[in-house]
Each structure stands twice: as C-alpha cells, then as structure tokens.
C-alpha cells in the first residue's frame, strides 16, 4: 500500500466499534491517500477466528503503541503487518507528503506563471496538445 502512495495505513476490527470509528475518522481527516483494513470474522466458515482479539470473548485487543512505534518507517509498518494472528490494531504507518491536489495546484500555478492566466481546462488542453 505504501508503494501505491498511501500516507496513512491502519487496521481495526468490526467488533471494536469505538476503535473502528476512531480509525475511520483519523483516515478521513488525514490529507492524502488513507487505507483502513477492517477485519471481520466470517461466522459461516470461520466462527471464532478473531476471538483472540475480542476482550468480551477472553481475548486481548492489542493496540499499536504510537509513542514507541516509528509511524514514518515503512520497515516498522511491514513488521507489524506480518503478524497475522490477528496482530496489532491501530495506525501502522503515517507520513506527510504533498497530496495529488496540492501537486496539481502547484503545477497549475507554475503553468499560469509561464503561459498566462488561462483556465485550468485550457491549460490541460494546451498540455495535451503539446504531447501529440
């Protein structure tokens, strides 16, 4: 997911509604490409498969300690993601980088300074015409 440009990656569980809402809210408010993996057991084929992570069933909902975890480290995020039993929950990776919209605005501003005050549509038409 990092190679696809994700700037925040988190894992939550459907049985932990408060945590799930926190992760969704954090992802929505994060500027950039956000991914929240939401685990949910299939009661038909794998009943009880996530009992180890549900406190009301005797399990432990193990959270990522963001104070100790280097959230900007791709290697640390990969290490967390390798534990499939069901692993830790929370934010695995978070970084700041320019968003697509910010880069596009920068490109448009730069293009306008070179070409003149054209509309965004006219700038794109001119750019595509130059590629022919």
Language-model features, listed with the residues they occupy:
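Conserved thiamine diphosphate
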Residues: 1-26
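Solvent-exposed alpha-helices and their adjacent loops that cap or buttress functional pockets
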Residues: 1-3, 27-30, 80-85
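Short low-complexity, flexible loop/linker segments enriched in glycine and/or proline
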Residues: 25-27, 51-52
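Generic beta-sheet signal
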Residues: 32-38, 89-91
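Flexible, low-complexity linker and terminal segments
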Residues: 42-132
């Amino acid at each position: 997911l990092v190679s696809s440009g994700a700037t925040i990656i988190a894992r939550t569980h459907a049985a932990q509604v408060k945590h799930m809402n926190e992760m969704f809210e954090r992802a929505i408010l994060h500027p950039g490409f956000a991914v929240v993996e939401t685990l949910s057991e299939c009661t038909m084929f794998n009943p009880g498969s996530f009992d180890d992570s549900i406190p009301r069933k005797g399990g432990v909902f193990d959270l990522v300690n963001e104070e100790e975890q280097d959230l900007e480290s791709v290697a640390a995020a990969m290490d967390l993601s390798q534990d499939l039993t069901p692993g830790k929950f929370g934010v695995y990776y978070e970084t700041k980088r320019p968003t697509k919209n910010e880069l596009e605005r920068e490109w448009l501003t730069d293009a306008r300074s070179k070409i003149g005050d054209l509309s965004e549509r006219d700038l794109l038409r001119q750019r595509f015409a130059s590629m022919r």
